Structure formats: C-alpha cells, structure tokens
Amino acid sequence: MTKEQIIEAVKNMTVLELNELVKAIEEEFGVTAAAPVVVAGGAAAGAEAAAEKTEFDVILADAGAQKIKVIKVVREITGLGLKEAKDLVDNTPKPIKEGIAKEEAEEIKAALEEAGAKVEIK
C-alpha cells in the first residue's frame, strides 16, 4: 500500500473511525497522539527572551500635521496604493511593518518621523 493510498483511505474515514484508528496506532506502537506541552520557564527565562528579541513591529502612533508626507512615506515602505495608505494613516495607531529586523525598524521609524509622524517600535 502506498502513502497516497493510505492518505486516500484516511480521507474517506468518519471522525469515529479516525478516532479508533488513532487509538489502535497508539496501542500498536506504544505512542500517544497528544500534543507536546511546553512548560513555562521562570522570570529569568522571560528576561532572556526579552533580551533576545529579534523581530520588531513598527507602529504608526499618529500621522501628525503633515499627513500627505506621511502617506507618501507609508506608500514607499509598504507598497500600498494611495487609498490603502491613506486609510492606514487616518486610522492610527496602526502597524506599518511587523516582524522585521531592528535595523529596518529603526530606518522606517526615522523616515516616518522625518515626515512628521509619531512612531513606536514594539
């Protein structure tokens, strides 16, 4: 029996049949299908994680008085169209970029602040 045939057979099973199959596999091979549980570390582990943060979010807190300049910068950074960039700038606070490197986040923050916006990096 090929993998494809096994997958096709599983696709055609009911939930009850799948449950029985899982139990049979657990008994046959001595394993469990339970998801692994991650134990939370103490305060020291939390401090290490905070110190090692590698991904940052750039949040536009306020567009300031020169919205047109800010919209232009947002369009350059995100590649959004005019309407989407304007909606983003008009509805602050909003994330501009998420999950980026610290250097890139700092560059984006500097460009937006130069245009008159208030920016946060989280």
UniProtKB/Swiss-Prot annotation:
One of its GO terms (biological process) is translation. SUPFAM superfamilies: ClpS-like, Ribosomal protein L7/12, oligomerisation (N-terminal) domain. GO terms for cellular component: cytosolic large ribosomal subunit. InterPro entries: Ribosomal_bL12, Ribosomal_bL12_C, Ribosomal_bL12_C/ClpS-like, Ribosomal_bL12_oligo, Ribosomal_bL12_oligo_N_sf. One of its GO terms (molecular function) is structural constituent of ribosome. It comes from the Bacteria. It holds the Pfam family Ribosomal_L12_N. Keywords: Ribonucleoprotein, Ribosomal protein. NCBIfam families: L12 (TIGR00855). Homodimer. Part of the 50S ribosomal subunit; present in 4 copies per ribosome. Forms part of the ribosomal stalk which helps the ribosome interact with GTP-bound translation factors. Forms a pentameric L10(L12)2(L12)2 complex, where L10 forms an elongated spine to which 2 L12 dimers bind in a sequential fashion. Forms part of the ribosomal stalk which helps the ribosome interact with GTP-bound translation factors. Is thus essential for accurate translation. Belongs to the bacterial ribosomal protein bL12 family. HAMAP family: Ribosomal_bL12. PANTHER family: 39S RIBOSOMAL PROTEIN L12 (PTHR45987), LARGE RIBOSOMAL SUBUNIT PROTEIN BL12M (PTHR45987:SF4). This is Large ribosomal subunit protein bL12. It comes from Geobacillus stearothermophilus. The gene is rplL.
